[in-house]
Amino acid sequence: MSETVIRTDDGTFAMINVFEVEPDRQKELADVMSEGADRFIRHRQGCISVNILTSLDGKRLVYYAQWRSKADIKATMGDPNVQYYRDKAAELAKPDPHAYTVFSVHHPEN
């Protein structure tokens, strides 16, 4: 099983989508994003992990997916099943998606 590990030297890419959502729709958005990730995204070539974070004030949802390559992200975004969930999410909230690489990671000293 893959898990989320954030490193600067592994060549992975992150697709981070920050949604602005009305607090009474945050749970619905989280359910939609979780269903899409479970049914389609996690099975796509190059997917390492998908994490869905909800803000405590109910106004944001962060969708954090790690990928092996930019090509894997692009291929996934072209999948009609993925597009369905992307469109459904956009009906519920304002998305702001971008691809990222890790610049630095910091851990506390033990």
Residue positions per predicted region:
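Short acidic, gly/pro-rich beta-turn/loop elements at beta-sheet edges
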Residues: K27-L29, R60-V62, I73-A75, E109
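An amphipathic, aromatic/His-enriched active-site/gating alpha helix that lines ligand/cofactor pockets
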Residues: R39-I48, Q66-T101
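Short beta-strand-to-loop capping motifs
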Residues: V18-P23, A65-W67
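Short amphipathic alpha-helical segments, especially helix-boundary/capping motifs
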Residues: G11-M15, Q26, G46-C47, L61-Y63
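Short, well-ordered amphipathic alpha-helices
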Residues: S34-D38
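Short, surface-exposed ligand-recognition loops at beta-strand->loop->(often short) alpha-helix junctions
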Residues: E20-M33
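Short alpha-helical
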Residues: D24, G58, R68-A71
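Glycine-rich beta-strand-turn "strand-cap" elements at beta-sheet edges
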Residues: M1-F13, E20, N51-L61, Y85-N110
